Each structure stands twice: as C-alpha cells, then as structure tokens.
Curated annotation (Swiss-Prot):
The lineage of its organism: Eukaryota, Metazoa, Ecdysozoa, Nematoda, Chromadorea. This is BTB and MATH domain-containing protein 39. Pfam families: BTB, MATH_2. InterPro entries: BTB/POZ_dom, MATH/TRAF_dom, SKP1/BTB/POZ_sf, TRAF-like. Residues 161-226 form the BTB domain. PANTHER family: BTB AND MATH DOMAIN-CONTAINING PROTEIN 36-RELATED, BTB AND MATH DOMAIN-CONTAINING PROTEIN 39. Residues 14-141 form the MATH domain. SMART domains: BTB, MATH. CDD domains: BTB_POZ, MATH.
Length: 335
C-alpha cells in the first residue's frame, strides 16, 4: 500500500506544488528553492546534503518550507503533505515520502524528512531521477487551517469585457487580456494575428465548453462533470490553458464515474501525469491489472512499464501475505 494512501480522500482539497531544480548534482550543503505563493504562505523546498560525507554514506534530506505572506505575528498554516521524486513523464520510478502533518509558523517554518534517501540513488547516471541535470519533486499539500491571513477575493469588475467570442451563433462577452494572459495560443490570435480586432468566431468547440473555459478563468462558479470534461480537456490542450487542464484533472481524480482504463488513456492523451500516478496507485487487484494489460494493446510504452512495475509490487505483497511461516519478513536481512 502506498504511503500516500491516507491522502486519497483529500483529493478535492489538495494542491500539488512542483519544483524543478537545475544542476542538482552540484548540491553541497543547504539549498532552498524559489517560493510559490499559495493560501497565505510562500512555499519552497529545502535540500540538505554535504559533499564531505563519504559517497557511500551521503544522504539527502528534504524539507517543505513555508514563509508567511503577512506581517501578522499570529500567522500559521496547518497542513498535511507528502512528496515524491519524479523523472521523465509517465515513468513509474518514484520515491514517496511518509505523510507529514505540521503547523507552520514564522518561527517553525520547515518540516520534512532528514536523511530521506541515499545521495547516489538520485544522482547516479541512469538512475532515472535527473533528466538533463534537472531534478523534479512534487508535494501533495492539503491545508486544513490558515490563521492570521485573509485571502483577498478578486474583484471581477476588473475583468472589463472588451471583446466577444462568437460560438454556435451565440455571443460570450470576455476580457481579451484575461484570455491572452492564460493562453499563448489565444495571445497570438488576439494580439499578433488580429491586432485591434475585438470579435472572434470559434468553430472547433461547443458554446458550453467555451463558456466553461471563460467561467474557469474568471473564477465564476462552474463544475466540471462527466458530460463536459472531455471537451474541456481538448480545449485546454488546444489553447494551452493550464487552469482548464487542472480543473479537469481534479475532477477525474475525484470521480468514480470514469473507468480506470479511460483515466489511463486520458493521462496519455493529455499528459496528465498526476492522474496516471494516482490511478495506477489505486489498482489493488492483480486480476484487474492483468485485464487492463490484456484488453488495452494500444497502451503507450510508458504507461505499460508503469503497470508492469505495479504488477511487481502486487506480486511481492501477495508473496508476503501467503507465506506460511507467519513471520514478518520486512526489514529482515539474510545471514
């Protein structure tokens, strides 16, 4: 069972923070990444590892760091989180941390795993965790309470409608700058290909899907569901709109109305790595896993490899559970 198991039911409240570290193999001492603002805190990752240690004994420590986004001395953020190391998209080589719970304050602003793994496990050539010298770590972060900080609500009147989208003979009033800021494709269409134009006709998508996209960007109330998620994924991919892709992925993580096979295909088509990781993690039946492999011959190589590794894990669990000696084998070494 994955160490992230306790976080499964918190998918609706979870935020994933991704950090990419350049030239990671040259780390010596302590390094703190650039921060990301989220829910009243500036979040960063801190690594600690010393070159003075013997190569066979050198370890890597990993900490989540949160600095206050306010001067309020009562500021604090209560969280649950776990992290994982990733290599290239879709590959199942990961290292997963235990679940941590912590309340970050101005004086106690870091929490993590000391000596989490061997240094060589990460930087050895072909280990899978350095991709062109870049090391990637993701934190699944669930915030249960924030004190001493009030998140400001955006004033939607600042999104002045200065343009129109015409879809299926219906008109949607939009802020062109808002569209352009969230989509490089729409930026080119609005400012480079058609400078000065304020009305744009969209032919490839339905009125409902375009309205959904605009609602997501304007932070209006909108729900992704089984009827619209596919159109929104295609729209988000075509226009390269991260916010739309994220909303669809969050829906797919929560819903039980979409099959495992469909989620795996979607993770390939739309490069939804987190969806693939969580979907494979939740497969706990060997027969189901074998059926997926047998019935989906068109599955991509990276997903196929990840499913094979999951099969190895399930077989290993079955062997331990079926052992007749009734002794615990985990952690034992042969003499």
């Amino acid at each position: 069972m994955s160490l992230l198991q306790p976080m499964r039911d918190m998918a609706a409240k979870m935020k994933t923070l991704c950090f990419k570290i350049m030239n990671f193999e040259h780390l010596d001492g302590s390094y703190t990444s650039e921060s990301k603002l989220e829910n009243g805190g500036h979040w960063a990752v801190r690594f600690v590892s010393s070159k003075t240690a013997k190569s066979t004994k050198r370890r890597l420590s990993v900490y989540l760091v949160c600095f206050p986004a306010t001067d309020n001395p009562e500021w604090s953020i209560s969280t649950s989180f776990a992290f994982r190391f990733l290599n290239s998209w879709g590959n199942s080589k990961t290292k997963i941390s235990p679940l941590c719970t912590h309340t970050f304050t101005a004086k106690d602003n870091s929490k993590g795993a000391s000596g989490f793994c061997a240094w060589d496990d990460i930087v050895t050539p072909n280990s899978g965790f350095l991709v062109n010298g870049v090391f990637t770590i993701e934190f699944d972060l669930s915030i249960s309470r924030t004190t001493g900080y009030q998140i400001e609500k955006k004033d939607h009147t600042s999104f002045l409608a200065d343009g129109k989208l015409i879809v299926e003979d219906q008109t949607i009033d939009v802020c062109l700058a808002l569209l352009a800021d969230n989509s490089p494709v729409l930026y080119d269409m609005i400012y480079n290909e058609n400078p000065g134009q304020t009305e744009f006709e969209i032919f490839d998508f339905t009125y409902d899907s375009i309205l959904g996209m605009v609602s997501i960007l304007q932070l209006d109330e909108f729900k992704v569901n089984v009827r619209n998620y596919r159109d929104l994924l295609e729209l988000g991919q075509r226009y390269q709109i991260v916010a739309v892709m994220d909303q669809c992925e969050e829906f797919l993580l929560r819903t039980k109305k979409v099959s495992i096979e469909t989620k795996l295909k979607l993770s390939e088509t739309f490069q939804l790595h987190f969806l693939q990781f969580r979907t494979i993690e939740r497969i706990q039946c060997m027969e189901r896993l074998e059926a997926i492999l047998d019935e989906n011959i068109d599955i991509e190589d990276k997903t196929y490899e990840a499913l094979l590794e999951k099969m190895k894990q399930l077989k290993s669990q079955e062997e331990k559970e079926s052992c007749s000696c009734k002794k615990k084998h985990c952690g034992r070494s042969r003499v």
